[in-house]
């Protein structure tokens, strides 16, 4: 196959920011390698084989990539219409999860989808829907952003309801989503006094979640344990051991020792396995990949000609990379345990699909701006060509 044919196929099928594509492919490869290394104990406990879990995870990774590809082919402006309904659907789903959800990490965070018998986290759908709809609402109210009734009240209601319901079972996810909402509102030129009101709504929602939710006591205990190093939790202790023993170049692929001790080495502590097996070099590479993803997402936001595209790309990029930073910070001892997975790397089902959708939408924004810039450049070239023809005829 000739290089020109390959380039033509890539240009046709992998549109948008090519750097983002490269970063996602690199993180997906790292995910397959590290998860395969860390699922031995899980397979043994469930009387299964590591190969079966490897195939399942690899399928999930490709499913996420497929979701990303489909999402990047769709004009990002359509998402505000489709996911407006998803925002309304998220409310009863979150309430149902709180009352009848499956236990995951000692909390009711998932529900089982009928027919396909797969666990699903409604908070993933709710987070994506809120970010998209918040970006849409603010982009439409740019001319009257100071209007309390038109611009502020809808934002306060939706942020308070969605973040509050998520906080009932997953406080850390609610806090990250709330921070993302604050960023979108700040970029969307929301007045500072209104941002202060949003903070007040967030504090009230958080207080209600601590009182009535299932994770209030756990969250306070984890914060206390983080402050008092003499009460270091089991996971945090062995996560730091993995980091400390990894050294500069690591123990090599498949040679982790803490993978057999950590309760979830393939999930929220997968970064510990990355450092233990690939050393400080591997840890830095993963960190840099996420920073590149953030930079390219923010660049797409900056280059966007439409307010909706800019707010959308900025919000999704920040939410995804902030989650990654929290996960890595917990592993190296910079924060209390949160249970947050490492996006695009941790083993997961529908979470991988929703992450793929988020990245695909970012790519859709970058693709749209590239096409507009290309169209403007082509139009300018045509004008210049016509002017030259006229000059030639006049001469």
Give the residues covered by each predicted segment.
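Hydrophobic, glycine- and aromatic-enriched re-entrant/interface helices and adjoining loop segments
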Residues: 104, 108-110, 196-286, 305-312
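Transmembrane alpha-helix boundary/anchor motif
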Residues: 66, 74, 133, 207, ...
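Membrane-interface helix-loop-helix junctions at transmembrane boundaries of multi-pass membrane enzymes
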Residues: 144-152, 194, 298-318, 374
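Interfacial segments of multi-pass membrane proteins
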Residues: 138, 180-194, 258-282, 341-355
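Membrane-helix boundary/helix-loop-helix interface segments in multi-pass membrane proteins
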Residues: 2-27, 33-168, 328-343, 347, ...
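Hydrophobic alpha-helical transmembrane segments
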Residues: 59-67, 277-294
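Loop-to-helix entry and N-terminal half of a specific, functionally important transmembrane alpha helix
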Residues: 301-339, 345
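Hydrophobic alpha-helical segments of polytopic membrane proteins
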Residues: 84-85, 90-91, 148-167, 171-211
